[in-house]
Curated annotation (Swiss-Prot):
InterPro entries: CutA_Enterobact, Ion_tolerance_CutA, N-reg_PII-like_a/b, N-reg_PII/ATP_PRibTrfase_C. Cu cation binds at C16, H83, H84. This is Divalent-cation tolerance protein CutA. Its cofactor is Cu cation. It is found in: Cytoplasm. It comes from the Bacteria. It comes from Escherichia coli O45:K1 (strain S88 / ExPEC).
Amino acid sequence: MLDEKSSNTTSVVVLCTAPDEATAQDLAAKVLAEKLAACATLIPGATSLYYWEGKLEQEYEVQMILKTTVSHQQALLECLKSHHPYQTPELLVLPVTHGDTDYLSWLNASLR
């Protein structure tokens, strides 16, 4: 169970999809090597449905869940966007309002 000390307003989760596992691995390795994210979770097997240029698309994708801090967020987003093969990649930032104190401390210590 989480206690009041686990409140946090400096960590964020970034969602990004990639077209395949190799691309997701490459993007994750890049942001981890540059210390822009502390952890990247890659979930293969996602199917995304969306309209693009007036046409319904359905694509196999890998969902990436990246953990970082607010202070690293912009650099992470810029890195992902500049190295991503999509013209308009999914880049969504979700605030972390609570989390395990030890995990959040590790997350902060893992970044540059």
